[in-house]
């Protein structure tokens, strides 16, 4: 039985976003006061992310016949992440050089309000390769869950899954308990998602109310350029990858449309993580693959953020007339290949990584961040949406490469020919 239009989450979130935009535009002061609604919803989602990742990864790994398959999946995923995120960085670099949205602005860095970006610059000082690696190791298991650090929880879950697998039949009771706990957690997710329209309304009303449409007009060329680049990346790059894998990118986008709308409202791809874990498994990807690829992708496969970082850095150089010859741009690309891996899928993280990149490159003024501070919030929607689609496609591709993809189920679900829960024999 089909859900009526008015009862569908897709329609409710879309309506809430539209109402939020109108409220923020016509009554900006009231719109700004709606911020707790958006923040509250995102906090509810973050509350559940750690246990979802733990349960999904542990049951996925412990339930596998061979531990070699887990290592192979991880290696394939990291290889894919590096290739695709590099393509995203290069595309951003090419487009911003061709369009040159910052050319002619002739901004003197000395006149910019450096205090406005001090908080991001300070946070960026902690962004280093060694610091990033050390941060993956939690000081305590409880601390990892309490802080909601995705990579720390993932590391513990992988180790726990390996250990549980080695116990064999002795660990069956623990496995069953975690699997039952997982069902409870996903039940909680279903309850939280009913609040998605309220969260999307609050976040959008606040954004428009605080920053206004005037900010959009002022630096509109960069925003439009970035959005078009993200669309082209999804359609051409991810679309080509999807076609080579045996599915349509447009049908996949339709399949995750509710998650995309939630991300559009909250500007954080992290807000859709729990549902993506569930939906990718229902699409025919083995649980162990989903549990490894999706959480890891939130730090290593942020395609939208990669495009944003190159475009924003070169835009600042163009606007402040800073020298950016081919050597400087190659240096920028190399730095971003490393620094972009530290961006989690949460609102504002891309801006912090950008600050770290400008500091590392040296010849670009960090104060130039003030130029895009006002519009960063509007660009985060495109970043988050591209990140979400990119991680979904990555999961299917990796699942196919390691022969853990149910092709029949994938085809049936995307073409609405079978219920999500129906299973088919795995094909190689």
Curated annotation (Swiss-Prot):
Please give the start and end residues of each transmembrane region.
8-28, 44-64, 76-96, 142-162, 184-204, 222-242, 326-346, 352-372
Keyword Transcription recorded: no
The parts of the chain that form a coiled coil are none
**Cellular location(s):** Cell inner membrane
* Keyword terms, alphabetized: Cell inner membrane, Cell membrane, Membrane, Symport, Transmembrane, Transmembrane helix, Transport
Q: Name one GO molecular function term.
A: succinate transmembrane transporter activity
Q: Does the keyword Cytoplasm apply?
A: no
Q: Which Pfam families match?
A: SDF (PF00375)
UniProt cross-references to InterPro entries, sorted A to Z: C4_dicarb_transport (IPR023954), Na-dicarboxylate_symporter (IPR001991), Na-dicarboxylate_symporter_CS (IPR018107), Na:dicarbo_symporter_sf (IPR036458)
Function noted in UniProt: Responsible for the transport of dicarboxylates such as succinate, fumarate, and malate from the periplasm across the membrane.
PANTHER family named in the record: AEROBIC C4-DICARBOXYLATE TRANSPORT PROTEIN, PROTON/GLUTAMATE-ASPARTATE SYMPORTER
Provide the family line.
Belongs to the dicarboxylate/amino acid:cation symporter (DAACS) (TC 2.A.23) family.
Q: Give the protein name, as stated in the record.
A: C4-dicarboxylate transport protein
